[in-house]
Amino acid sequence: MATETNGADVAASSPGMPQLDFSTWGNQIFWLVITLVIIYMVLSKVALPRIAAILSERQGTITNDIATAEDFKAKAKDAEAAYEKALADARAEAQRIVAEAKADIQSDLDVAISKADAEIAAKAAESEKAIAEIRAGAAEAIQQVAKDTAQEIVATFGGKADAKAVDAAVDGQLKG
């Protein structure tokens, strides 16, 4: 019990928390300054250079990535321009091929049309010639039939038909 009583006396005689005991503040401030200086030295010599190196490396990586992205963007623009040019060239080539094909087809068509026109003209001339021959033949046939009919009519009425008179009468009627 003596120790308990002695501990109780010490507790009763001490002013409270040791940090708030003004008699030890000088020592506390000294050790606080020493601790802060040591922490500052450790941070400035070890931790802060590592952090600065990491931040610098990160900034370099970001800068390199941005530069790479800009290069890729420029390459993409160049590729797009090359694509557009190739597309325009292909369209121009296609239009040229279409124009050539149209010209070839038109020339073939013109040749075929002129050939068909020549054939039609030749057949029309042949047909006109045949029609003229048929008309001439028909006119002669009509003339002969008219003469024969006139002779038969005269013979039917009891007269004797003079061939020269019948020919002259039929020719006169047919001509005018």
From Swiss-Prot:
Localization terms from the record: Cell inner membrane
A Pfam entry, by short name: ATP-synt_B
Keyword Methyltransferase: no
Sorted UniProt keywords: ATP synthesis, Cell inner membrane, Cell membrane, CF(0), Hydrogen ion transport, Ion transport, Membrane, Transmembrane, Transmembrane helix, Transport
Self-association and partners: F-type ATPases have 2 components, F(1) - the catalytic core - and F(0) - the membrane proton channel. F(1) has five subunits: alpha(3), beta(3), gamma(1), delta(1), epsilon(1). F(0) has three main subunits: a(1), b(2) and c(10-14). The alpha and beta chains form an alternating ring which encloses part of the gamma chain. F(1) is attached to F(0) by a central stalk formed by the gamma and epsilon chains, while a peripheral stalk is formed by the delta and b chains.
Function: F(1)F(0) ATP synthase produces ATP from ADP in the presence of a proton or sodium gradient. F-type ATPases consist of two structural domains, F(1) containing the extramembraneous catalytic core and F(0) containing the membrane proton channel, linked together by a central stalk and a peripheral stalk. During catalysis, ATP synthesis in the catalytic domain of F(1) is coupled via a rotary mechanism of the central stalk subunits to proton translocation.
Protein name as annotated: ATP synthase subunit b 2
Source species of the chain: Roseobacter denitrificans (strain ATCC 33942 / OCh 114)
